Regions:
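N-terminal Sec-pathway targeting helices
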Residues: 1-14
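Short loop/turn segments that connect beta-strands within beta-propeller blades
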Residues: 141-144, 186-189, 238-241, 336-338, ...
Length: 599
């Protein structure tokens, strides 16, 4: 029946396009056609394979007691996008361990009965498991998958229909929307408490990020940096009321920009953007989540690509937006109370490949005593910075990197790796304190891009997609992807002090999901083929795996309910850009066979 519906969807979509409905309803028709396309491309998808390799030149790290375990959250909960606001993703739970993980099994499943770009970073707090879709927020029993409540919101869809999860603070939940708002809900009932607009929907700006919340403030920004005129902003809101406490521009404020709140102090001006007339400064959206150093009071904000994403030129500059294009592709450090600028780390100066800083950085103290910030953007590298002096300690490749210096010229197709949806995506690296290893999941997928000429770029209307790709095919707006039979995924385990990899795992599907190490010596993650894995954290060897029936691109978390450890996974990701199997969005809860919570 599903196959028949998919083929009918193909016919309806093509008929609609030929009748001109695509122009009238581009979001809806792109979504329908994209689902049909994904179905066709995923036919005969192979079973998952995962192969681990040890680095012969660098022996595996010795297991020692943890030196930097962030205790800012209850051990049995997972109360924030990356468990704690320092984003380490490490769990101190150890009931599921290397000796018994082979007994892991699916205990229950909650089916949302919707096709969705299900990227939600799940949270579990106060005996409730919370997640989001593009339009819904829901609360589940974390042991049984029973629905506590589910709240639906109606608003116009966006061409990039994602939501990456909720935040929790003081009995309230917070999420962003596709029409540019932040919404607050009662944790127990799902009743909406307030709504605050923080972006301009007419410029296709939206709020897909998972907020973080701390000491009365909610931190969140907006995306929209792939659309003409869209700019990234970062905000702090009062948790109780939604009032904007401060705002910070991630791209230069220019004539016509209207702040929504008090502006944090910033040295940024337009001098690093030398755009010609008809090419407004655009980009630097922030679209994943954030990291907070609660002791220092510093907020770390990942910034997205400059726009147009692809421009004529290369390493020496371009004709469309000369300069370094600050603060695009940067981690910007702000005073968490005031929004004042403190520092920035510019990872991809003058980006012409669409290589956002696409995930929150992690903050750790390494075994060697260094205070380190590590981050893995879409350029296929893991970066480590010493926070004592902001110096770069290492920049190491963690996926395939090819032909990245080739300039873009109108009329010429350029093939490069990683592509615009390659490298590190929206889930952060993780840290294993016992072995001093940083774990990073990566996408190995190459693209070809042919850029538009400057005259065409200037003619694009404000608020329209502004990638710079010359293509009539709507699925090639962000470049033409290689066949999915040629894609892959990696998990790299890298020494946090040196940047040298200790072990690496290669999957035949991209790895986008959260990566979660535990005190039981186990690492959990999944791939876009729906394969869920448990590895030995010390050497990367596969201990257990199971296909969960849909692409895994969201939260992978672990928590305990009445003393029994559980693992929850967001499964069933479907999106135009990814040729995955078409499955409804689900939350899958796993535990040990025969293990029941304490009464």
């Amino acid at each position: 029946m599903r196959k028949m519906l998919a083929f009918v969807g193909v016919l309806v979509a093509f008929a609609a396009i030929s009748g001109g409905l695509y122009l009238a309803f581009p979001v809806q028709m792109s979504t329908n056609l994209g689902l049909a396309r994904s179905y066709l491309l995923s036919l005969n998808a192979p079973a998952g394979t995962a192969t681990t390799q040890q680095n012969p030149a660098s022996p595996a790290s010795a297991y020692t007691p943890a030196v930097d375990v962030d205790a800012s959250a209850q051990t049995e909960d997972w109360p924030s996008y990356n468990r704690t606001v320092k984003s380490q993703r490490y769990s101190q739970l150890s009931q599921i361990n290397t000796k018994n993980v082979g007994r892991l099994k699916v205990l229950c499943t909650y089916d949302l009965e919707k096709f969705a770009a299900f990227e939600s970073g799940l949270i579990m707090v106060d005996n409730a498991l919370i997640g989001t879709t593009q339009f819904d927020i829901f609360s589940l029993d974390p042991a049984t998958c029973a629905e506590n409540w589910r709240t639906h919101e109606d608003y116009p869809p966006n061409l990039l229909p994602s939501n990456r999860g909720p935040a929790y603070l003081d009995g309230m939940l917070f999420r962003g929307t596709q029409d540019g708002r932040v919404l607050a809900y009662d944790f127990k009932t799902g009743k909406r408490l307030w709504a605050t607009t923080i972006s301009d929907a007419t410029l296709s700006e939206s709020v897909p990020s998972a907020p973080i919340a701390f000491e009365g403030l909610v931190y969140v920004g907006n995306s929209g940096g792939d659309f003409k005129g869209g700019k990234g902003h970062m905000y702090a809101l009062q948790a109780k009321t939604g009032k904007i406490v401060w705002e910070f521009y991630l791209a230069p404020k220019t004539d016509g920009d209207a702040p929504r709140g008090p502006l944090g102090a910033s040295p940024l001006d337009a001098s690093t953007w030398k755009n010609p007339p008809g090419m407004p400064i655009s980009g630097s959206g922030t679209w994943t989540s954030y990291t907070l150093d609660t002791r220092a009071g510093l907020l770390y904000v990942p910034g997205g690509n400059p726009s147009p994403d692809f421009v004529q030129g290369g390493p020496e500059g371009s004709s469309g937006r000369e300069g370094q294009n600050l603060y695009s592709d940067s981690v910007v450090v702000l005073d968490a109370k005031t929004g004042d600028y403190k520092n920035h780390f510019h990872l991809v100066p003058h980006d012409w490949h669409d290589w956002d800083v696409s995930n929150p950085p992690i903050l750790i103290q390494t075994r060697g005593g260094r205070q380190l910030m590590a981050v893995a953007p879409k350029d296929g590298h893991l970066y480590g910075f010493d926070l004592a002096d902001s110096s770069l300690v290492y920049r190491v490749p963690v996926t395939r990197v090819e032909n990245v210096d080739a300039p873009f010229v109108p009329g010429k197709s350029v093939h490069f790796c990683p592509g615009p949806v390659g490298g590190g995506e929206w889930n952060s690296p993780a840290y294993v304190p016992e072995t001093n290893l940083i774990l990073v999941g990566e996408v190995d997928w190459c693209y070809s891009v042919t850029v538009q000429d400057d005259k065409t770029l200037r003619g694009v209307p404000r608020g329209a997609p502004w990638t710079g790709m010359a293509a009539l095919n709507p699925f090639h707006a962000f470049g033409a992807a290689d066949r999915s039979s040629d894609w892959a995924g990696w998990v790299y385990a890298v020494d946090a002090d040196t940047g040298v990899w200790k072990w690496r795992l290669k999957s035949n599907y991209p790895i986008v999901s959260g990566i979660t190490p535990t005190a039981g010596g186990v690492v959990f993650f999944g791939d876009m083929g729906g394969n869920f894995y448990a590895l030995d954290a010390g050497n990367g060897e596969k201990l257990w795996s199971q296909n969960l029936g849909g692409a895994l691109a969201g939260g992978v978390i672990t928590y305990a309910v009445k003393g029994a450890q559980r693992v929850a996974v967001a499964a069933g990701f479907t999106m135009v850009a990814w040729p995955t199997k078409i499955r409804t969005a689900k939350v899958v809860i796993l535990g040990l066979d025969g293990d029941t919570p304490n009464q």
